[in-house]
UniProtKB/Swiss-Prot annotation:
It catalyses: 2-O-(alpha-D-mannosyl)-3-phosphoglycerate + H2O = (2R)-2-O-(alpha-D-mannosyl)-glycerate + phosphate. Disulfide bonds: none annotated. It comes from Escherichia coli (strain K12). Keywords: Cytoplasm, Hydrolase, Magnesium, Metal-binding. This is Mannosyl-3-phosphoglycerate phosphatase. The gene is yedP. The lineage of its organism: Bacteria, Pseudomonadati, Pseudomonadota, Gammaproteobacteria, Enterobacterales. GO terms for cellular component: cytosol.
Length: 271
């Protein structure tokens, strides 16, 4: 049992979870965002998006100043009041976007894997793929420690590609719509654990944690949460956790922000 009155952190994925996968609407979640803000409960966004995209969304959602996890955990944007922490305002895990791009270009040229990265196209194309405005699409290209791509080869070649990346110290991660390449040392779980430890160090008490996500790349995050909401999503693979004790994990019947609201209702409204 837990409540929003105790030390609590909420970690949330964006697309398909807090945001509608198609319209990017978040209004069904607005009442809970307001309630959490009024209770001084940090809502920490955690996504494959770039920090530039997420800072814009943070402001839109009324969450500015809080930490966030970008690029599937490869980037941690620190809270505004954490200026004394080394690396402020952002901590980068592993090798840079530019270095990963060089590896991918070499694999494509020498081993003929077929894929299209966000670096290969302009913001108009990304806007068409995603439904974002061109100005928002431009923010998706500001990667610091990962590469986003569309896979255009066979499943067999994907297995070979994944193995080659692993040999080179990289990982290949599936998101709700796209695939992501990042350093093997990075992850949403590691980033979340770092943020949890920082809050614990500052307050003297470990906060209870609740995570919400809808895609396979959210599983590592949800595994390290005390409580988890698996929002019904579009991805055919779904989300599968090692510990799916119903006292800890709730699978929603609704999608997107309505599922987000359903998950919060489940864990808090009856308590």
């Amino acid at each position: 049992m837990f409540s929003i009155q105790q030390p609590l952190l909420v970690f949330s994925d964006l697309d398909g979870t807090l945001l509608d996968s198609h319209s990017y609407d978040w209004q069904p979640a607005a009442p809970w965002l307001t309630r959490l803000r009024e209770a001084n409960v940090p809502v920490i966004l955690c996504s494959s998006k770039t920090s530039a995209e997420m800072l814009y969304l943070q402001k839109t959602l009324g969450l500015q100043g809080l930490p966030l996890i970008a690029e599937n955990g490869a980037v941690i944007q620190l809270a505004e009041q954490w200026q004394e922490i080394d690396g402020f305002p952002r901590i980068i895990s592993g090798i840079s976007h530019g270095e990963i791009s060089l590896v991918l270009n070499t694999l494509r040229e020498k081993e003929h894997f077929k894929f299209t990265t966000f670096d290969d196209v302009d913001d108009a194309t990304i806007a068409e793929w995603t439904g974002l405005s061109r100005s928002q699409a431009a923010l998706t290209q500001l990667h610091e420690a990962s590469v986003t791509l569309i896979w255009r080869d066979s499943d067999e070649r994907m297995a070979q590609f994944t193995a080659r990346l692993n040999e080179l110290g990289l990982q290949f991660m599936q998101g709700a719509r796209f695939w992501h390449v990042l350093d093997a040392s990075a992850g949403k779980d590691q980033a979340a654990n770092w943020i949890i430890a920082t809050y614990q160090q500052l307050s003297g008490k470990r906060p209870t944690t609740l995570g919400l996500g809808d895609g396979p790349n959210d599983a590592p995050l949800l595994e390290v949460m005390d409580y988890a909401v698996i929002v019904k999503g579009l991805n055919r693979e779904g989300v599968h956790l090692h510990d799916e004790d119903p006292a800890r994990v709730w699978r929603t019947q609704r999608e997107g922000p309505e599922g987000w609201r359903e998950g919060l209702d489940h864990f808090f409204s009856a308590r």
